[in-house]
Swiss-Prot record:
InterPro entries: Endo_dU. This is UPF0215 protein APE_0476.1. Pfam families: DUF99 (PF01949). Belongs to the UPF0215 family. It comes from Aeropyrum pernix (strain ATCC 700893 / DSM 11879 / JCM 9820 / NBRC 100138 / K1). It comes from the Archaea.
Amino acid sequence: MGCDDGRVEKLGPQAGFTAVACISWDNRLRLPLAGSLGLVRVDGVDATSVLAGLVLRLGAAGRPVLLDSLTIGGFNIVSPPGVERLTGSPVLAVYNYRPSLERLESGLRSSRLPLAGVRARVLSLVEEAAEASTPHGPVYLVAWGLEASEARRLVLETQVYGRKPEPVRIAHYTASEASEALRRV
């Protein structure tokens, strides 16, 4: 299963919401099975509960959840331990670049968002990012509830066109289109 947010046009307290999509994926057939949409507040604190709700709505509790970052909708942070606690699902963030805790914390400080300390504690997980080589190039994995070998295997099974796992890529396009449709309403 892959989850991602749509385009975020504006950050800060007046930003509103953006769409988030979760797409369940069949590794054997290499195709999407179902999807679900939700809304998260940009720079809010609801990403973990919204993603967990989408996972449960898709009947995918216990199945790994792939992300392309621990941030959704600006600095709305996904807590891997929280998702696992709510759904029983391990979480794997697959970065195309080595994530920088220093840059994330700097952005978080300058944003002056509430609960900055809690957000920073979750973001500190990126310090554990492990490089993994794939046929499409290197990726950096932040895994919660998965062994390193299992995380790499999952990435290899879900890569189709590039380094980003296909269910995450499809979730991004789905959420982006939904976000665009919301802006037109």
